[in-house]
Structures are given as C-alpha cells and as structure tokens.
Amino acid sequence: MESVAYILILTLAIGVLFFAIAFREPPRIEKKEEK
C-alpha cells in the first residue's frame, strides 16, 4: 500500500513540474516561429 502513496506523490510532483514547464514553453515557441 505504501508504494501506491509514493507513486501518487511522484505523479503529482511530475505533473506539477510538467505543468510549470508547459506554461513557460509557449512564449518561447512563438519566438521560434518568427525565425
């Protein structure tokens, strides 16, 4: 049962990290399109 909690916390951490990166990526992608 402990592994389930660890996986949940890990997934949540990765999800938040991915969300933060995905939100900071779009602006840079727009600049790349200009090139």
Curated annotation (Swiss-Prot):
It is a single-pass membrane protein. InterPro entries: PSII_PsbT, PSII_PsbT_sf. Keywords: Membrane, Photosynthesis, Photosystem II, Thylakoid, Transmembrane, Transmembrane helix. One of its GO terms (cellular component) is photosystem II reaction center. It is found in: Cellular thylakoid membrane. The chain crosses the membrane at residues 3-23. GO terms for biological process: photosynthesis. The keyword rRNA processing does not apply. The keyword rRNA-binding does not apply. SUPFAM superfamilies: Photosystem II reaction center protein T, PsbT (SSF161029). PSII is composed of 1 copy each of membrane proteins PsbA, PsbB, PsbC, PsbD, PsbE, PsbF, PsbH, PsbI, PsbJ, PsbK, PsbL, PsbM, PsbT, PsbX, PsbY, PsbZ, Psb30/Ycf12, peripheral proteins PsbO, CyanoQ (PsbQ), PsbU, PsbV and a large number of cofactors. It forms dimeric complexes. Belongs to the PsbT family. Found at the monomer-monomer interface of the photosystem II (PS II) dimer, plays a role in assembly and dimerization of PSII. PSII is a light-driven water plastoquinone oxidoreductase, using light energy to abstract electrons from H(2)O, generating a proton gradient subsequently used for ATP formation. This is Photosystem II reaction center protein T. It comes from Nostoc sp. (strain PCC 7120 / SAG 25.82 / UTEX 2576). The lineage of its organism: Bacteria, Bacillati, Cyanobacteriota, Cyanophyceae, Nostocales.
